[in-house]
Design a protein with these regions (language model features):
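Short gly/ser-rich loop at a beta-strand->alpha-helix junction or flexible surface loop bordering the NTP-binding
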Residues: 1-197, 320-360
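Surface segments flanking catalytic/ligand-binding clefts of nucleic-acid enzymes
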Residues: 1-13, 17, 178-360
Length: 360
């Protein structure tokens, strides 16, 4: 029997002050010290910590350094996509292979198994960065890679989250932030153009043209992805509306239809029972004020994401019998189990029998 190697996983920014640590077996021969309390940590924090630890474990398992590419590069930068349990993606010269990573058990939480994928596609440029000792491709190259090769839902969400962070988006200083975002978008599209009209080009171009820095989290970005895939009208995010002395910032606004579409997440409602009740009263008042001002308000919550086709039908009925803009028709593709299955994210309830995913 060989003794396991132990790696120390650098904590994500939100856990820098966490004094407690937990030892977890990540893969054969390698354990990691996770910067969290196995008893009191939320399951999603455990999944995030294990995802980071797996990246470092993969690097430690190779004699020669690998280049972490695509989503793995972006996650090291704190940019989260739709999948909460993504594969680790690397590039190594003349290597194309996929291997498995076992499930991990932290307290009462089990993080499902995933994989290590050795990409056949080399980085778009020779630019390399180093993040906490790991070699990565340029972050812009990583996002272009995702737009070309990942599923539309995943790459769109990653793109929105990347623009949000890279532009340092603030709803109170939107002009400056959106100017920075457009400069970044121009560079992203230029890198895509240098890659040539390769397979996936049209979809990647549509994604990079429509991602928006105004999405505060992956759930809002996923909602915007659906809306943009079916709506030909101008769609805006984080729009300020003043009603009766109240100031509201709208997740998604379609002015031509006088329509507001918003995501209701747990974080918006508070944590304690008192905060929850207060938040509910404020949401009721908010909705009433917006409707009295002539806006139609549509709300979407986590359970709606359990059935993408049904949610898309619901939104299509609200938007009316219209066709999406030509480029935006490339945005839609029903997510597969590899992107959206129960091994990849949390569900609001046990997935129903027959819940639809694309086979490929």
């Amino acid at each position: 029997m060989t003794q396991d190697s132990i790696i120390i996983t650098p904590p994500a920014a939100s856990h820098r002050e966490q004094p407690t640590s937990t030892l977890v077996r990540i893969m054969r021969g390698i354990c990691a010290v996770l910067p969290l309390d196995s008893i009191n940590s939320n399951p999603w924090d455990v999944w995030e910590a294990v995802a980071r630890a797996r990246t470092y474990a993969v690097d430690a398992s190779h004699k020669h350094s690998s280049i972490f590419v695509g989503q793995s590069c972006l996650r090291l930068l704190g940019i989260r996509g739709w999948s909460q349990n993504p594969p680790v993606t690397i590039y190594r010269d003349n290597r194309i292979c996929t291997s498995s990573l076992p499930s991990c058990h932290v307290g009462s939480t089990t993080v499902p198994a995933t994989s290590v994928s050795c990409s056949e596609f080399p980085p778009l440029s020779e630019e390399r960065n180093r993040i906490e000792g790991l070699v990565v491709e340029h972050p812009y190259d990583a996002l272009v890679r995702c737009a070309l090769h990942d599923e539309p839902l995943e790459s769109f969400v990653l793109g929105c989250m990347a623009l949000n962070i890279w532009s340092q988006f603030s709803m109170f200083h939107q002009d400056e932030c959106r100017r920075r975002a457009e400069e970044i978008r121009t560079e992203l599209i230029a890198r895509l153009e240098r890659a040539g009209h390769v397979r996936g080009y049209r979809r990647a171009h549509a994604i990079l043209k429509t991602i928006d820095p105004g999405c505060a989290n992956p759930a809002e970005a996923a909602l915007l992805w659906l809306v943009r895939s079916i709506c030909p009208f101008t769609v805006k995010t984080q729009v300020h509306i003043g009603v009766r002395g109240h100031h509201y910032y709208i997740d998604i606004l379609i002015e031509d239809l006088h329509l507001i579409i918003e995501f209701d997440g747990v974080a918006k409602l508070g944590e304690s029972r008192i905060e929850l009740e207060q938040a509910k009263r404020e949401w009721v008042l908010r909705d009433q004020n917006l409707r009295d001002a002539g806006w139609q308000v549509i709300r979407v919550s986590w359970p709606d994401y359990d059935d993408w086709e049904q949610l898309r039908i619901r939104l299509s009925r609200v938007l009316g019998p219209i066709n999406p803009a030509p480029d935006c028709r490339f945005l839609w593709k029903l997510p597969t189990q590899r992107c959206d299955g129960p091994l990849r994210r949390f569900y609001s309830r046990t997935p129903r029998m027959g819940r639809k995913h694309s086979d490929r």
